[in-house]
Curated annotation (Swiss-Prot):
This is Aspartate carbamoyltransferase catalytic subunit. The lineage of its organism: Bacteria, Pseudomonadati, Pseudomonadota, Betaproteobacteria, Neisseriales. L-aspartate binds at residues 84, 166, 227. Heterododecamer (2C3:3R2) of six catalytic PyrB chains organized as two trimers (C3), and six regulatory PyrI chains organized as three dimers (R2). Its EC number is 2.1.3.2. Coiled coil: none annotated.
Amino acid sequence: MPNPLYRQHIISISDLSREQLECLLQTALKLKAHPRGDLLEGKLIGSCFFEPSTRTRLSFETAVQRLGGKVIGFSDGANTSAKKGETLADTARIISGYTDAIIQRHPKDGAARVAAEFSRVPVINAGDGTNQHPSQTLLDLVTIYETQGRLDKLKIAMAGDLKYGRTVHSLCQALKRWGCEFAFVSPPSLAMPDYITEELDEAGCRYRILGSLEEAAEWADILYMTRVQRERFDEQEFAKIQGKFNLDASMLARAKPNLRVLHPLPRVDEIHPDVDATPHAYYFEQATNGVYARMAILSLVLNEEV
């Protein structure tokens, strides 16, 4: 079967068809079961992180090395010519002359598409502002499939910061292709953006607003937690909402046996450590799947056949 992702930029989940997502998913599962160390042999990958990252940067760089490739790059935009005023377009032009692909994280929405416009090699978006995080979405899909045995018509609850959380935006855009049903739990000021709910309406996917994490845990197959960021509230308002969106083990008492709790990490207070010991916790395994998801992206973008 032809590889539908060869030499393609990976910028946004909305750019990818269900066929392409399924190809990525199955390749990630295949590489997890049967690792290969030759798929990036002779390839040099640019790792360009203009803002801090732990899991995304290290898992991408791990993926490159496990596939037999090499990495050059930076982990802080302050140490690059961007500090001198070089445009992102020029940076992309230059680095694409050195490398076979560029992995980029940037604080500005839309930065990945700018880089892709001027790069001579594929650009993989490792997060651009509050916009998109497609490689996180792929590892989420791998994890959901791994725990549920399917993606079709699952019940997906999302909690916390749904307005600024790029992970939940991308995940909704992916899972709508499988006819999933959604539930949202958040402060009103951090509700899921209208453009996402409009996309769900257009896809015929039902969604509901729930008032508590207990309701979400009882209803869902997947409970996807995100961090409510203190810096978006004054202290008094934050104190009112903080505990309401923190999950502890007691809230899972009526959960279905197949429920799995996911989180893009890092967590702060929104998942109590007592959840870690429950059979529902799966966020550390989710993070591990990041390596295999990113191995799949790199392998497919840089090889005609995998």
